[in-house]
Amino acid sequence: MKKQTLHSPSYFVSGGKNPESLFAWKNVNCEIRNRKGEVFFEMKNVEAPEGWSQLAIDIAASKYFRKVGVPKTGHETSVRQMVDRVVKAIVASAIRQGGYFATRKEADIFAKELKFILLSQRGAFNSPVWFNAGLWEAYKAQSPSEHFAWDEKKKSIQATKNAYERPQCSACFIQSVDDSIESIFDLAKTEAKLFKYGSGTGSNFSKIRSKYEATGSGGKSSGLISFLEVLDKGAGAIKSGGTTRRAAKMVVVDIDHPEVLDFIDWKMREEQKAHLLIAAGLSADFEGEAYRTVSGQNANNSVRVSDAFMKAVEQERPWKLKARLTGKVLREIPAGEVWNRITRAAWMCADPGIQFHDTINKWHTCPETDIIHSSNPCSEYMFLDDSACNLASINLVKFLNDTGDFDFESFIHTARTLFVAQEILVDYSSYPTQRVAQNSHDYRPLGLGFANLGSLLMRKGVAYDSDEGRAWAGALTSLMSGVAYLTSSEMARAKGPFAGYRKNSKSMLKVMKMHERALNQVAWKMLPAGIDKAVRNLWKGVLYNGEKYGYRNAQATVIAPTGTIGLLMDCDTTGIEPDFSLIKFKKLVGGGEIQIVNQSVDAALASLQYFEDERQAILKYVEENNSVVGAPQMHPEDLPVFDTATAMPGQRVLSPESHVKMMAAVQPFISGAISKTVNMPSTATEEDISRIYFLAWKLGVKAVAVYRDGSKQSQPLNLKEKPKVVEEVGVPNFTMKCPECGSDTVLTSGCYRCPNCGTTVGCS
């Protein structure tokens, strides 16, 4: 039977029009200043769509525009150029690969639709696509390469010669590491290659022998922590994408490793050392002498816990720590003691996070190949070792129409278009090792996701912490994943399923049925009529097509932190996070900023049917008080709609439980996991953190990290004032600062994001 090709319909752009002609354009000057008021970045006469904010344009120009080798101007000067080079590269690669489009006309229609989506800020690819894609095609950019890519003619993985002809486009990598010097330092090399081109990577280091075990020559092993310190220093020396952000990495250790207690305490202990040095007069900057002196500051740390361990904690039973090579029990300690060390460290410095091993592998589509051991730096991508995932995120707010209704049809079209583009990127891209390249080609995992959920809910007048809010989140996530997997099955019909599908077909179809059964958890009655039936029919199609054709991609969706690309899309909130504050700072043309009320507040008041004069009075009150509590004309029953992740003392704030419940509403419909910070007040106790971790486990969340207000003492920090020693823990109070421009950062979705220059730390 002749294979089919994908149909690419016109939707946003019709009648032979160019997508650029559907936008009004403007020219602005970009200027970013550091905390001293000095110009940090400057570019004159930058062209962008009229609807883009000054901040979004600043992000595009400073982070994503090509800065060298562009004919005539020397650097890119327009959002039009940036989007054009990326889209042309993707479509040209699709034509070379074959099987995606029946004709050049179909390919041209797809290119127009994708351009419109990107220019209208309905969606965006992960940062490495903007950094690297299209630079060879548009500007003949060259850089020596030690990467590997799929060769369509030779039907095998081949070494590449030019880093930009087959660019690195995936943000997320998971790499294996074995118990040998060669493997450990091979990892150091591949990590450096990934960081250089703007990606992040994670590894599970549990195979490495502990300091309590012998080497092959009869001596004692150096131990896990000693090697982690070496790799940490390497990451600290590299900025991803040249100058865009620091290296992002994840370190995972299993709960039965003999050095797990040292690992749990590692970052906390090192930060205490740094603070003693700072108190003695050394610089508090992240790149200052104090933080350069200590280790453990350049990664997110997570402990991999099993159901057996969690039950041992509940039942107050002992826990066994086992030798890596022999499996011999080296030590037996109360499970509760290990657990208390985890919650204590998280209380003091927000690390380590927790990954729930059995929950993760319960939803694994390819267990016949191997189990899932680790994740990327922000914990949203969880798949096989030595694999990669390119991300794209949809801006949910862009699908609210003038009446406040959600445009499901255009959302579906956007999700499908982005997903096809992501699939094309798999074999367009290169990878740091031959094994990662082979697994990427053979399994083709993708990470479609969304941003701005918190803003969407507020604008609709729906409380984040409500059954209706969780119903919206679950419905939109199930719809997005259903579209992605249905599209994947259509691509499998056209080009064949992923190479590892046959071995894993039963397991993958089982997981698809689990996703479908989870639809029964959504409170559909709280949503617009007909959505329930439409989503259920969609998933019937996913199962029918999957059984008939298989799937082109082993994974389809994640919820990423959308750190920098969230700013590019003018998102008020990232990932599934709630709004951070009712007050925002708006950047002005030519520099500077003004304080404004979050735009979602007025939209919410309109959705709740407040009159114009009532809305204006409430907005004025919010501007002066950063709260709706006590505002004139405010109805008490509407107050939960305006609850945020943080608040001034005594004001309304979302509970930590509400964060976990939102994660649980979304998790059953995601291939991977969710990058999310559970915000907790400064008054939270270790017992409170323990309760949140247990709640996440019991609700089926795959991974969780907490942030107790004022606790974080790693990453880019600066003293806000003369240190006040906290008597109980012996460390000073600090305020987060951007390592690039020095502005205050915001912790969101597990990442520190600078709203001034767009720098992110820990995000990919």
Curated annotation (Swiss-Prot):
Cysteines engaged in disulfide bonds, as pairs: 172-389
Catalytic function, reaction form: a 2'-deoxyribonucleoside 5'-diphosphate + [thioredoxin]-disulfide + H2O = a ribonucleoside 5'-diphosphate + [thioredoxin]-dithiol
Assigned EC number: 1.17.4.1
UniProt remark on cofactor binding: 5'-deoxyadenosylcobalamine (coenzyme B12).
Task performed by this protein: Catalyzes the reduction of ribonucleotides to deoxyribonucleotides. May function to provide a pool of deoxyribonucleotide precursors for DNA repair during oxygen limitation and/or for immediate growth after restoration of oxygen.
NCBIfam families: NrdJ_Z, PRK06556.1
Pfam family of the protein (one): Ribonuc_red_lgC
PANTHER family, A to Z: RIBONUCLEOSIDE-DIPHOSPHATE REDUCTASE, VITAMIN B12-DEPENDENT RIBONUCLEOTIDE REDUCTASE
One record GO biological process: DNA biosynthetic process
Keywords: Cobalamin, Cobalt, Disulfide bond, DNA synthesis, Nucleotide-binding, Oxidoreductase
Catalytic residues (UniProt): 376, 378, 380
UniProt-recorded name of the protein: Vitamin B12-dependent ribonucleotide reductase
Domain of life: Bacteria
Alphabetized InterPro entries for the sequence: RdRp_reductase_class-2 (IPR050862), RNR_2_N (IPR013678), RNR_lg_C (IPR000788), RNR_NrdJ/NrdZ (IPR013344)
Family, per entry: Belongs to the ribonucleoside diphosphate reductase class-2 family.
Binding, substrate: 127, 171-172, 200, 376-380, 561-565
Reported cofactor(s): adenosylcob(III)alamin
Molecular function via GO: cobalamin binding; cobalt ion binding; nucleotide binding; ribonucleoside-diphosphate reductase activity, thioredoxin disulfide as acceptor
Signal peptide positions (record): none
UniProt lineage: Bacteria, Pseudomonadati, Bdellovibrionota, Bdellovibrionia, Bdellovibrionales
